[in-house]
Design a protein with these regions (language model features):
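Alpha-helical transmembrane bundles and membrane-interface segments of multipass inner-membrane proteins
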Residues: 1-177
Length: 177
């Protein structure tokens, strides 16, 4: 499929806009939490289902690697985030002609990875605050960046399952001719 320079620029602009929107929303919500709540403070939104709970996550998404030595963990997690940033950016730039689902997925992953990396570099931890429990099972607190990364990965998976080829808009031929 051939893509014009203009179309490629539009794809890249949209990709950048989605990534920056995720980054802004992530950092804005984390800022609200850190300014209005104390660490480990909870505010119930939906009883027995959803709380806002301020957690300082020194591990990875959903608390993974929380027990790893802090000096090794910082290097490991920051390195992973930088590698993800480089791979996702390079792939997105090379595949701007691919599906919208792929581009949105990559943009969500990039925005989320950068959001959590900023926290880790600035604070040494990631601010988590979305706290869900379902049928008595508690899920580790997470944030907007984690959500964007998970949705982005799901979109990449869906993109691998099938193409979303959309025919180009154009004049519809008249019936019978």
């Amino acid at each position: 499929m051939s893509v014009s320079v203009r179309e490629s620029t539009l794809y890249r602009g949209a990709y950048l806009a989605v990534s920056l929107a995720v980054l802004f929303l992530d950092q804005w919500t984390k800022g609200l939490v850190t300014r209005t709540m104390e660490v480990h403070q909870s505010k119930t939104i939906i009883s027995d289902v959803f709380d806002l709970t301020y957690v300082r996550n020194t591990g990875a998404a959903f608390g993974l690697f929380a027990s790893v030595d802090s000096s090794i963990k910082a290097i490991m997690l920051n390195s992973i985030a930088v590698i993800v940033f480089l791979i996702v950016s390079a792939y997105a730039l090379r595949s701007s002609h691919k599906s919208v689902r792929l581009q949105v997925g990559l943009a969500l992953i990039l925005g989320g990875a950068v959001g959590n990396l900023l926290d880790r570099v600035r604070f040494g931890y990631v601010v988590d605050f979305l706290d869900f429990a379902v049928s008595g099972h508690h899920w580790p607190a997470f944030n907007v960046a984690d959500s964007a990364i998970c949705i982005g990965v799901a979109l990449l998976f869906l993109d691998m399952l099938g193409s979303e080829e959309v025919p180009a808009a154009g004049p519809t031929p008249a019936p019978g001719g």
